[in-house]
Amino acid sequence: MTEDVNPKAIMDFLKPRMGARFKTWVEICTHCAMCADTCHFYLASGKDPKMIPAYKVRFLKDLLKKKGRVDKEYLQQIYNTIYYECNMCRRCTLYCPFGIDIAFLISTMRGLLTSLGIAPEGLKKAVENYKLSGNQMAVSKEDWVETIQWCEEEASAEVVGLKIPIDKKGAKIMYTVNAREPKFYPQDIMEVAKIFAVAGEDWTVPSEKGWDDTNLAMFINDAATARMIVENTFKRAEELEVKQVAITE
């Protein structure tokens, strides 16, 4: 064991989530292995028994049995399984005779590790960027607006009269993007602007937080940040009094 792992922190995270359904899913599995052939990781590994979905969620039952008294090496095993051996596609659940939502259990373990400060570095950085700037790429408001204006100028050379309205109140559609677009792929924004222009659509983009429609916080089950990201978008939509939010991600 190691003092670096706090059993109380583990149990404090799990206990509020241990409702009747959670307990049923953890306890009811009969290890029938009907989920095995539904898992692409299992099939791609040459049918390694450790890749069977039911086996992957054994950690939860173990954590509860040990009351969180595990070492860092054990947490590393959990990390490797929940991030590199499962992408939560839910195919296994469709074939489970008890309907055990293995993806939910995997997500719960991701949330647990996130609460302990353990998550892929790229995702951790993106989540911090959301908190600081409202988007995963840490694009400032000034850079975002400047990029939109540049996209309008470039695209209008091909479609005469093309405009990319910013903060147009009462527009029908508020368009949101993947934050990688203004950072690396502004041409994607131009192509959409051309479509809207030719279609004669009434649209706008927000200048403030809410224009990034990605939500990488979901992948590490950081529920608070995931909620903040969604709320940013809908808050801006309400402020601009638009009728629809278009999300391409």
Task: Annotate each PLM feature.
Residues 16-17, 23, 61-248:
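Iron-sulfur-cluster electron-transfer modules
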